[in-house]
């Protein structure tokens, strides 16, 4: 497969995952804003920081972190290349470039998503309509994901797409935890004790892990358990451990298909071995913020190495 085609499949999947992750962040911010009007603007800024969009937002709107302005910026602002509308278009453009490597079902799902969400976000989304709009974004992404896993051959094209998905997801989870890490520190909440219900629920809901956490831990809420669940629990599809294992798995499949070991493959193996083998208490003892910063640095370096090894840009 040409590097350009592999890169298009990889970025198609990354952009689709990014649009869904941002929709979940907006939903979490919206829930907090409904219950805590006195701190709503601080929470909306936190959403922008997590999504990596705060700098661009402040350039355009200064310190006005009102709900409607932030939501509109993240959903549909044409001047924001990371808005959901923008990344859906980029996903569709990449899918079109690699169209001959996609099944008809995958292409139609991506194209339908672009048309449906383009129509939905053509106008400003009112506050009362926001939950339905965010649900539609998640639903469209689910249809693409279903078509991808249900109809694609398990060849290099599939593995490049999955690699993009899980690298993007790992980056997103680590950013959420890094922005919110102060909530999990002993200075704010005793390790093993309870922390603010609205805030921890926001963390879990923003990664679709609220109900799964309840199934596993019941009503017991603690900083240590939340961090352990989202970092080390390998059965959770949005934990760092799960994402890293999938990255290593799909890179391994690509390497076997090409009969060639790469630096990216070695880096992925090291990421799983070095970053996910310590127990959660050791991670806290060493500094949660430092751990997450190191993880983000490692995944960023891995993503850049993937692009070099497989010549996404000639």
Predicted regions and their residues:
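Alpha-helical transmembrane segments and their helix-helix packing motifs
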Residues: 1-314
């Amino acid at each position: 497969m040409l590097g350009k085609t592999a890169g298009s499949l990889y970025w198609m999947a990354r952009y689709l995952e990014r649009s869904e992750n941002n929709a979940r962040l907006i939903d979490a911010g919206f829930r907090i804003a409904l219950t805590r009007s006195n701190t709503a603007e601080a929470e909306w800024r936190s959403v922008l920081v997590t999504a990596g969009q705060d700098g661009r937002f402040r350039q355009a709107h200064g310190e006005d972190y009102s709900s409607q302005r932030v939501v509109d910026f993240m959903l549909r602002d044409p001047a924001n290349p990371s808005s959901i509308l923008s990344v859906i278009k980029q996903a569709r453009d990449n899918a079109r470039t690699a169209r001959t490597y996609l099944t008809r079902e995958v292409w139609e799902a991506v194209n339908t998503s672009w048309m449906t969400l383009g129509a939905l976000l053509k106008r400003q989304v009112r506050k009362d309509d926001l939950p339905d709009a965010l649900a539609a974004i998640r639903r469209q992404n689910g249809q693409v994901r279903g078509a991808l896993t249900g109809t694609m051959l398990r060849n290099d094209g599939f593995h490049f797409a999955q690699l993009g998905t899980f690298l993007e997801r790992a980056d997103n989870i680590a950013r959420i935890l890094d922005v919110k890490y102060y909530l999990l520190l002993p200075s704010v909440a005793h390790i093993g004790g309870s922390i603010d219900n609205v805030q921890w629920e926001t963390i879990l809901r923003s990664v679709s892990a609220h109900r799964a956490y309840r199934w596993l831990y019941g009503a017991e809420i603690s900083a240590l358990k939340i961090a352990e669940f989202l970092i080390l629990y390998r059965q959770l599809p949005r934990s760092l451990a799960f994402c890293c294992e999938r990255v290593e798995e799909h890179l391994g499949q690509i390497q076997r298909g090409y009969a060639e070991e790469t630096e990216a493959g070695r880096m992925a193996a090291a990421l799983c071995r070095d970053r996910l083998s310590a127990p959660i208490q050791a991670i806290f003892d060493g500094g949660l913020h430092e751990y997450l910063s190191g993880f983000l640095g490692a995944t960023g370096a891995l993503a850049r190495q993937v692009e070099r090894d497989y010549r996404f840009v000639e």
